[in-house]
Structures are given as C-alpha cells and as structure tokens.
C-alpha cells in the first residue's frame, strides 16, 4: 500500500487543484493524478493515483514526492475521490475560493 498525506483540494473560479505528498518505494517512481475512466454524473471528480516507475536502477529508499492535479471546469466540483489499486484512499471536500 502507498502512503499519502497532506491532501488538499481547492477550486478558484474554474481551476480545480488537488495536491498531496505521496511516499514512494524509490526516487525513480513518479506519482500522478489522472481522471478516472469512470466518473459519476454529479459534481464530484474521481482521480486515479498512478505510480510510474522510471527506467534504470534506483536505490530502494522510501521517498516523499509531491503530486498535483490541475484542470479547468465549467462547474463547481464539490468532492474529489482519489483511487489507488481499485480502492478509494482519500475523499476530499473541495474548498471553493473566489
């Protein structure tokens, strides 16, 4: 299981920004937040946390890395659900800022 912390979700006007810190197995792993293939029809957003391993040899050292997702929406997003390995790992209420 991947550890994560410091999750925030804010929407300023139309820009949704979700960010966190993810602990990965080595410095060659890059965490990404991408829209899930399955979205509900409400004002929620489902994001998949994907871990991409770079080619090469990397020391097996647990490493904290930032992850950020930004996207313009034409509507207010109220909730963000973050999914990793098919399980919801975080549910965030979006802080709307104007």
What are these regions (language model features)?
Residues 1-98:
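Exposed, flexible binding/inhibitory loops of compact, secreted disulfide-stabilized domains
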């Amino acid at each position: 299981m991947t550890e994560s912390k410091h999750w925030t979700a804010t929407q300023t006007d139309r820009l949704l920004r979700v960010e966190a810190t993810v602990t990965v197995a080595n410095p060659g792993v890059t965490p990404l937040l991408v829209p899930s293939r399955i979205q509900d029809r409400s004002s929620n957003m489902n994001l998949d946390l994907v871990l991409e391993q770079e080619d090469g040899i990397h020391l097996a050292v647990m490493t904290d890395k930032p992850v950020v997702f930004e996207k313009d929406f034409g509507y207010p997003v109220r909730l963000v659900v973050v999914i990793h390995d098919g399980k919801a790992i975080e549910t965030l209420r979006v802080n709307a800022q104007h």
